[in-house]
């Protein structure tokens, strides 16, 4: 194996890990040669009401696309995360919660969490929520967010969690698509010392003329500050819970019954409702949580992701709780009020496993390692990274400053669509290279293909595809199976196209090189460029806009917008700021353009297609080798854009 920056598995980790290198190779081989037998065995890791006999029926043919796992079995996700732990672990901590203000602390045992979930499940039923209904959830990072998700799962309702940073328009589009009758929110969230007007955002979203489905809004009092109240529609969380019974028989769900919807940015504009089902998802989330993080009974596990993202679903709620872990939930941001907060929380709660994002690591790096002078960190055993590829220098900083060079780093690659981790080191099995996601998880068959779909062998670079299904895979785009086929299976026939490019080195390790489609990864969160462009063009002074990602020291990728103004509109710094605020209001703070360059014209082909590769290179300040511009209708546009670019390094 090439030794360039190779970090060997620590011997004490290898000796005690669930999986060592020899076992990984044996299990991986079995998982791809005999997936039926492999998953028949590992499907038993969760509790089934009616055991499955059929394991796998999947087709990646875009004309006959179907994905079914454990499909004649029945179960309930809430029972797997709660009830099955009660006999031995009712008094074990399920959730440790720390508020934005470190003085705010709460804990819930598995017994207490079970009671809360049963009560809220009954409360939902009292408001007419039935099996198969979509419930929209717009909550802060409080234990009640997990309660809501598990209560929905208990009664067979489908939760659709919307990230608390999204705008009213974004909420409205998700409510409309899911036809939600019930929305659950809080008066306000608290994050980084600021209050987030969650209820006000919901009110604005529901005032949208196309939102006609919502009958009830359940409001948790988080801050207690006064909020607008709609009589007959709005109900206080506390008043529902006062009268709700603590006993709730769980619905028996088919393995392929929907568990949740999570909307993700598409390159075509409208967000896609990614649908995950119950059986395969839970098997995969719990198995990857145990093996990728080498989770051991009694450990404290902290995933810093927001519940509004897939990482919060799979590795803050379902995976860890199915495994009976104690999870830490933090309401705020791990570098507030000072960058030392992350270390303080690790020490305060004796965290053993930390799962966070490169964007936070880079932000902490920028503050300097002396911020961690008072940090002990001796409880930490395993550290993970998620959301985007981590650059090697951030990896090394994380390893040295947070992990004290003792903790293996699992740099995990996966997507909303995959349900769980697909490519990652295993702590006791995989020597790591900073910046590489390394090897596939069990049952996952990655490949690289060229633009014609031909598989490329050996050390190479290409489009990353997956050749066969795995249990955690999404099943469809909600209400639009054709879009599911078109987005993921038509580009390269018979394969799942990830939308990412990757490089495979001579050791067979995978290095993710980033999106190859029109999606930007900002601080580990995906945004469709079409969404941002649509928001800009909706402004009265904008004639045309093109949006690309560019390298950003903190966020990984920043948003660079080229804007052509309407005739007669004057370019000004005031207008630039107005447009930034406009996008922020239309989509959310995450989508705010970092740089807006005025563009008299955009590079287009004669058929009118914008040539984004030129725009990406100019935004990245790579202006010496732009490639062939002969297909452009007006090549002179390029020179002007280079001349007026904003991201130049002097």
From Swiss-Prot:
Can you cite an annotated GO cellular component? cytosol
Signal sequence span is none
Q: What is the lineage of its organism?
A: Bacteria, Pseudomonadati, Pseudomonadota, Gammaproteobacteria, Alteromonadales
Coiled-coil ranges per the record?
Answer: none
Source organism per entry reads Shewanella loihica (strain ATCC BAA-1088 / PV-4)
> What is the name of the protein in this document?
Acetyl-coenzyme A synthetase
- The gene is acsA
Reaction it catalyzes? acetate + ATP + CoA = acetyl-CoA + AMP + diphosphate
Query: What EC number(s) has UniProt assigned to this enzyme?
Result: 6.2.1.1
Q: Which family does it belong to?
A: Belongs to the ATP-dependent AMP-binding enzyme family.
Decide whether keyword Methyltransferase is in the record.
no
In its record, the post-translational modification comment is: Acetylated. Deacetylation by the SIR2-homolog deacetylase activates the enzyme.
Q: Domain of life here? A: Bacteria
């Amino acid at each position: 194996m090439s030794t360039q920056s190779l970090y060997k598995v620590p011997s004490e980790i290898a000796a005690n890990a669930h999986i060592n290198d020899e076992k990984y190779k044996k299990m991986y081989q079995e998982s791809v040669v005999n997936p039926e037998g492999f998953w028949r065995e590992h499907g038993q890791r969760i509790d089934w009401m009616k055991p499955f006999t059929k394991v796998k029926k999947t087709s990646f043919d875009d004309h006959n696309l179907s994905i079914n796992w454990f499909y004649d079995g029945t179960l309930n996700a809430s029972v797997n995360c709660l009830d099955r732990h009660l006999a031995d672990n009712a008094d074990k901590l399920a959730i440790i919660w720390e508020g934005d203000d470190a003085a705010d602390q709460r804990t819930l045992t598995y017994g207490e969490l079970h009671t809360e979930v049963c009560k809220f499940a009954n409360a939902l039923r009292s408001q007419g929520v039935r099996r198969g209904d979509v419930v929209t959830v717009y909550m802060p990072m409080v234990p009640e967010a997990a309660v809501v998700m598990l209560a929905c799962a208990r009664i067979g309702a489908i939760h659709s969690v919307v990230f608390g940073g999204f705008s009213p328009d974004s909420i409205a589009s998700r409510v409309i698509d899911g036809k939600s009758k019930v929305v659950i929110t809080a008066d306000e969230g608290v994050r980084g010392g600021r209050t987030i007007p969650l209820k006000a955002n919901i009110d604005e979203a529901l005032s949208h003329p196309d939102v006609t489905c919502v009958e009830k809004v359940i409001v948790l009092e988080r801050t207690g500050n006064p909020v607008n109240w709609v009589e007959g529609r709005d109900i206080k969380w506390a008043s529902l819970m006062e009268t709700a019974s603590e006993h709730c028989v769980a619905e028996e769900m088919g393995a392929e019954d929907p568990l949740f919807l999570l909307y993700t940015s598409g390159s075509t504009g409208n967000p896609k409702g990614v649908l995950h089902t119950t059986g395969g998802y839970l098997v995969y989330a719990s198995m990857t949580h145990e093996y990728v993080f080498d989770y051991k009974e009694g450990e404290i596990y902290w995933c810093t992701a927001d519940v509004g993202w897939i990482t919060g679903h799979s590795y803050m709620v379902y995976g860890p709780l199915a495994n009976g872990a104690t999870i830490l939930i933090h309401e705020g941001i791990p570098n507030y009020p000072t960058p030392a907060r992350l270390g303080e929380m690790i020490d305060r709660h004796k965290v053993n496993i930390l799962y966070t994002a490169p964007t936070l690591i880079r932000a902490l790096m920028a503050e300097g390692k002396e911020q961690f002078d008072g940090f002990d960190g001796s409880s930490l055993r395993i550290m993970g990274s998620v959301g985007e590829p981590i650059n090697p220098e951030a990896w090394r900083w994380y390893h040295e400053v947070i992990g004290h060079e003792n903790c293996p780093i699992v740099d995990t690659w996966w997507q909303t669509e995959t349900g769980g981790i697909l490519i990652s080191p295993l702590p006791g099995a995989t020597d790591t290279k900073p910046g590489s996601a390394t090897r596939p998880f069990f049952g996952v068959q990655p490949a690289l293909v060229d633009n014609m779909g031909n598989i490329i062998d050996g050390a190479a670079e290409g489009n990353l595809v997956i050749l066969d299904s795995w249990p955690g895979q999404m099943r469809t785009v909600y209400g639009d199976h054709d879009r599911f086929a078109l987005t993921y299976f038509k580009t390269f026939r018979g394969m799942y196209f990830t939308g990412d490019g990757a490089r495979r080195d001579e050791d067979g390790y995978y290095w993710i090189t980033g999106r190859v489609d029109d999606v930007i990864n900002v601080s580990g969160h995906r945004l469709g460029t079409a969404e941002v462009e649509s928001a800009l063009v909706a402004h009265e002074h904008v004639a045309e806009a093109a949006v690309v990602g560019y390298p950003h020291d903190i966020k990984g990728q920043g948003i660079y917008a080229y804007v052509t103004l309407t005739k007669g509109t004057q370019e000004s710094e005031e207008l630039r700021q107005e447009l930034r605020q406009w996008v922020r209001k239309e989509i959310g703070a995450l989508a705010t353009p970092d740089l807006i360059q005025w563009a008299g014209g955009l590079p287009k082909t004669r058929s009118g297609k914008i040539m984004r590769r030129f725009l990406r290179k100019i935004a990245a300040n790579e202006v010496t080798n732009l490639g062939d511009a002969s297909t452009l209708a007006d090549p002179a546009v390029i020179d002007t854009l280079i001349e007026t670019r904003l991201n130049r390094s002097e």
